[in-house]
Amino acid sequence: MTHTAPQPADQPVFKNAAYTQEYINIAESLDGDIPGRRAARAYMDSSTAIVHHRVVSTSFVPKLYDTASRQVMREVVETTHRILCKVMQHYLDDAEYRKIFDYDPRLAELILVPRGYDALLPFARFDIFLDENTGDVAFCEFNGDGSSGMNENREITHSVEETATFKEFARRHHVEGLSLIHI
């Protein structure tokens, strides 16, 4: 599934690149914000963002999304969730439809076990690529079985939000965290 955002001629679709450049310019105006970088690194070194027994590496420059890019991602993810729920419900309701999936019989039996809650897909992670020049979106993968990256994202965000660079950027713009639980 690909989604293309409407765009006026000769206009960038999103402000993300401009936000990133502004953030870098702020850091440069603060002589690189060396104290902020050191504090961010120290935070990460004592954080829970650990993969394969190592603290994750990160950039001092966070990924900055404007409202338009968040809206595109929200629409794509919510539409995809609705489609997947319809497919899942049809699978549960129609024995003939289940045949096209060719699941191992043990798995098919487990899928049909009553859930005990209303949501068909209570948790999902949709990994997408957003082309910030065109607004096109492409999927990398769908996950309904894990929360990979959520802790790391939270810790990386916390590592920079007390820096002088981040505070100055946030003074100029409305900034809020990008929740991996719900966009």
Region roles according to the model:
Residues 1-181:
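Preference for protein termini
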